[in-house]
């Protein structure tokens, strides 16, 4: 057997993205949750201390600073290798009043408000579809609804949780006044987002007391349908209906319809999930505990089991996932190794990799109002460049390089233009006698120049003689086309026909026609011999028409 090629290529290096962050928010206290405003450049973060911060960022200022730092680094480096440099803005959240007081709003980051919102850590953050209100839940099981721009609490409630579990996930309906929360014991509660009153409850959704890892909307089925992920299963249910009747059914009863539809056991923890296109809802992707993405298709098997797997990172976990929302069949997923992967679900492979941190895992992913990726860990949040911004940056660099090359070549072009003017003056003085020559190409092509001059002179002499001997008006169109065809036939015929009288020319043409008609008759006889039988003609396709080589000559009665 031949030896296998063991050349190893690091796929991460090949797929490493050229996109950079435009902003990095650093936290000295552990970060537990983040949420991005759907319509403005606002990001809200919740910490383990119970504090909630609301910041506004200026994309134009941050992008300009990034470009300036990159240019400055290139000019200062002078081709020398150096350590990794952060070109983007780094903003310390906790020490902002000390370290960033002199920069103010010019830094591109502005603190809108901060407050001690909960006793204990902030567990969940959710925003309205228009970004007017923000909902937060802490380990104190207190739900608060506040205005995003002011931070003022407009309504709050104490969520009764008899089993003592803490809330792990909260989702706000994009179209209706529904607020859905899941806890560590597999319980889902549905609240009215206006009154914060409970309207429905589902218990033990995932095989007992398994925690709710993720909840997202199943809009393709119904505006009230939602999907939850817990432990090793996927479930979907109606937010208006309780599942108490499911516990009265026999566990082995597979015919009765249940309120909660549960998938097969995946034998691995299902941590996060999303639809590739939430509006279409044809492909569902889940992040697994073993570093694999599983692809589900509701129309194929009603979410009973996965249909495809995409390998992301071996011996790692996929902790968070969001769609790109760019109509490219791709999703972003955050991994425990600190990388962000862009996976093409249609191709079934990773197409781009970005590094969030070499020391921390990626716990949160979100998209800002302009579909930029936001990644978060325990100590920092990064807002990344979009692909359009990177392409515009490359175009600007190319235009600058072109302008530099043009400015460098101005002196050369001026000297060349002066020399060209001198040459033009010399050629004008020498070329006055040759100005009447048409199509003189001796300067362009030296080889064959004499032949081209002789041919052109013969053509011009022939045209002059023809115009003197016979007027152009007396020539017939058919005879003109016939002469063209005869000229294309053979060189010997051209030598014989030149200088013949009208009668001799007609006689020569008649002889050619007789010979061609005899040849056509012989071809027809051969064709009849080779004609297929009637039985075989049924199986034949259309036959191309035979080529007619009669030079287009039909009649000479009028000559």
UniProtKB/Swiss-Prot annotation:
Residues 535-544 have a biased composition (Basic residues). InterPro entries: WD40/YVTN_repeat-like_dom_sf, WD40_repeat_dom_sf, WD40_rpt. The keyword Nuclease does not apply. Residues 418-428, 520-534 have a biased composition (Basic and acidic residues). One of its GO terms (cellular component) is nucleolus. WD repeats lie at residues 26-67, 77-116, 117-156, 162-201, 207-247, 265-306, 313-347, 354-394, 428-470. It is found in: Nucleus, Nucleolus. Keywords: Nucleus, Repeat, WD repeat. GO terms for biological process: positive regulation of transcription by RNA polymerase I; ribosomal large subunit biogenesis; rRNA processing. Pfam families: WD40. Residues 391-417, 482-494 have a biased composition (Acidic residues). It comes from the Eukaryota. Residues 386-500, 515-559 are annotated as: Disordered. Its main location: nucleus. Belongs to the WD repeat WDR55 family. PANTHER family: UTP15 U3 SMALL NUCLEOLAR RNA-ASSOCIATED PROTEIN 15 FAMILY MEMBER (PTHR19924), WD REPEAT-CONTAINING PROTEIN JIP5 (PTHR19924:SF31). This is WD repeat-containing protein JIP5. It comes from Vanderwaltozyma polyspora (strain ATCC 22028 / DSM 70294 / BCRC 21397 / CBS 2163 / NBRC 10782 / NRRL Y-8283 / UCD 57-17). The gene is JIP5.
